[in-house]
Amino acid sequence: MACSTLSKSPKDKIDPRDLLIPLILFLSLKGARSAAPGSSPHQVYNITWEVTNGDRETVWAISGNHPLWTWWPDLTPDLCMLALSGPPHWGLEYRAPYSSPPGPPCCSGSSGNRAGCARDCDEPLTSLTPRCNTAWNRLKLDQVTHKSSGGFYVCPGSHRPRKAKSCGGPDSFYCASWGCETTGRAYWKPSSSWDYITVDNNLTTNQAAQVCKDNKWCNPLAIQFTNAGKQVTSWTIGHYWGLRLYVSGQDPGLTFGIRLKYQNLGPRVPIGPNPVLADQLSFPLPNPLPKPAKSPSASNSTPTLISPSPAPTQPPPAGTGDRLLNLVQGAYQALNLTNPDKTQECWLCLVSAPPYYEGVAVLGTYSNHTSAPANCSAGSQHKLTLSEVTGQGLCIGTVPKTHQALCNTTLKTGKGSYYLVAPAGTMWACNTGLTPCLSATVLNRTTDYCVLVELWPRVTYHPPSYVYSQFEKSYRHKREPVSLTLALLLGGLTMGGIAAGVGTGTTALVATQQFQQLHAAVQDDLKEVEKSITNLEKSLTSLSEVVLQNRRGLDLLFLKEGGLCAALKEECCFYADHTGLVRDSMAKLRERLTQRQKLFESSQGWFEGLFNRSPWFTTLISTIMGPLIILLLILLFGPCILNRLVQFVKDRISVVQALVLTQQYHQLKPLEYEPQ
């Protein structure tokens, strides 16, 4: 054991579980199960499990893209890696993390010696304590950890029960007494029902021996998470273990740790100056015409200096009025191409009261991915609940009875780790918020349920009679008119328009493009809404600072009375600013909007991109396409038709010529000869 006063007793007098190797496994998870509060549980992060030595330096790591608390890989660090910069016993106290295995290598015996080798690989092992500083010592360590009478054992650290105070601390590798071990590879097979990990060898002794002879790390461990370890929520504070070798004499040991780090896959949005009130864009003024340059006369040849034209600047962002008009204009274009009879004369009104957007449940074909795609990192959190969704569509998960009216088809997720990605132009509306991607692991672990929806702005449709009636002076009370929203008129355009485009051709394709323009206008409006809320939050923070300054002044004035609270005879009068939650949510919303914009642009094909880049390209193609097609048909079939026509004329002419020639001659009658 770790204490020099604790010596090994005969096997018939003590519990054989008394011999353990100290291994400290520090499993620190950056963020407990409540990490990233308010985010979608299906959001994918870049997760990295790092194994550290006793000094908390990373010596081994593995990374992957998964939702939080769904990825528990097997950790396979080498035992000697954990000893880097560790206790002097292992011979690696001066080796930095991620260092290559130190030499010299062992000799190859009868097959020949290697340059710089120290000892024969086939030499019988002595009773020297195994170390990691040479290939021969690592071979000795391999045989010690694999033999039936040897091995190693692991003792838990800070998360052990309080009654196990006799197990000691890091100086004894948490194995100061027998009975503290919970896992390892020893002949008594230590185990536990509450510990968070199990540790074993990852290679057989024959496999490890050959790797050791090649002067490499040859003692990999296999660390697996138990069911208890996958359920704990205290990884942020870290958990430690100790590992000790089971050898004769004092058991050597070491300490190491494992921590989990995660980071968002989305882009980092820069934060710049943001005014309290967004400026409204005025109508652009026409650019003044450039003054004509005077031509140099023959008598005056002084050269004139021509100032270079200013470099083109990026157009300013659209103001509030322009954004709202873009929403209405996009709604009109989409409605005009899908239902042209309804746009002969109508009024489209943008609703100014919340909710500003509504969802339409649709049926669509989602894609199944075994690995997390890029759009799974865009975790949207718009204030869209299932109560604001209409229609019937595709549902996934355990849908409660109160929301089953939204489901036309309900699917159950199977077991396994895979991802369900919504089609382009749609989102999954879950009870935890909007998300473009679902994790089957999260759905199976929780009671989450989702509906496939389209997102539409709240634009109402009115016939002209409704608007005219508002200005007529009538004393008759009319019935409340029925308002049709854009979602009811165009619901399902994303899935229906794309499917119809395959069979109907150009019309459906243009309709889909108009929907994409409306979708882009919706994204721009959501960005401006986010900026407006951010401005409001900053204004509230500024007001809070003024309030706190006034409060401090009042406390000084009422200092003799015991402060402002005592003067007002109030028990407590503290001020708490909760705008930090708003600031965090707005930063996440800004990041998700940027990610969704990139995903929308990347989903467009090269053919659609040509129409979007050049506004005059569509008009040019539609104008010259007809004449070009006619000219192409003439060039393809014209020579054949012309040859047929010429041959027909030649045949008719030859017939006429034959008739003319036959009219100029008469048939001679045969002469009869009389016999003489």
Swiss-Prot record:
The keyword Acetylation does not apply. The chain crosses the membrane at residues 621-641. A lipid is attached at C640 (S-palmitoyl cysteine). Disulfide bonds join C80-C132, C106-C121, C107-C117, C155-C175, C167-C180, C212-C218, C346-C349, C346-C573, C376-C430, C395-C407, C437-C450, C565-C572. InterPro entries: FMuLV_rcpt-bd, TLV/ENV_coat_polyprotein. Residues 294-308 have a biased composition (Low complexity). A motif (CXXC) lies at residues 346-349. Residues 35-620 are extracellular. Zn(2+) binds at H89, D120. The keyword Glycoprotein applies. Specific enzymatic cleavages in vivo yield mature proteins. Envelope glycoproteins are synthesized as an inactive precursor that is N-glycosylated and processed likely by host cell furin or by a furin-like protease in the Golgi to yield the mature SU and TM proteins. The cleavage site between SU and TM requires the minimal sequence [KR]-X-[KR]-R. The R-peptide is released from the C-terminus of the cytoplasmic tail of the TM protein upon particle formation as a result of proteolytic cleavage by the viral protease. Cleavage of this peptide is required for TM to become fusogenic. The CXXC motif is highly conserved across a broad range of retroviral envelope proteins. It is thought to participate in the formation of a labile disulfide bond possibly with the CX6CC motif present in the transmembrane protein. Isomerization of the intersubunit disulfide bond to an SU intrachain disulfide bond is thought to occur upon receptor recognition in order to allow membrane fusion. Residues 482-502 are annotated as: Fusion peptide. Residues 1-34 form the signal peptide. The record marks R479, E480, L659, V660 as: Cleavage. Residues 35-270 are annotated as: Receptor-binding domain (RBD). Residues 548-564 are annotated as: Immunosuppression. A motif (YXXL motif) lies at residues 665-668. GO terms for cellular component: host cell plasma membrane; membrane; viral envelope; virion membrane. A motif (CX6CC) lies at residues 565-573. The mature envelope protein (Env) consists of a trimer of SU-TM heterodimers attached by a labile interchain disulfide bond. The surface protein appears to be responsible for the neuropathogenicity of PVC-211 MuLV. The YXXL motif is involved in determining the exact site of viral release at the surface of infected mononuclear cells and promotes endocytosis. The 17 amino acids long immunosuppressive region is present in many retroviral envelope proteins. Synthetic peptides derived from this relatively conserved sequence inhibit immune function in vitro and in vivo. The surface protein (SU) attaches the virus to the host cell by binding to its receptor. This interaction triggers the refolding of the transmembrane protein (TM) and is thought to activate its fusogenic potential by unmasking its fusion peptide. Fusion occurs at the host cell plasma membrane. The transmembrane protein (TM) acts as a class I viral fusion protein. Under the current model, the protein has at least 3 conformational states: pre-fusion native state, pre-hairpin intermediate state, and post-fusion hairpin state. During viral and target cell membrane fusion, the coiled coil regions (heptad repeats) assume a trimer-of-hairpins structure, positioning the fusion peptide in close proximity to the C-terminal region of the ectodomain. The formation of this structure appears to drive apposition and subsequent fusion of viral and target cell membranes. This is Envelope glycoprotein.
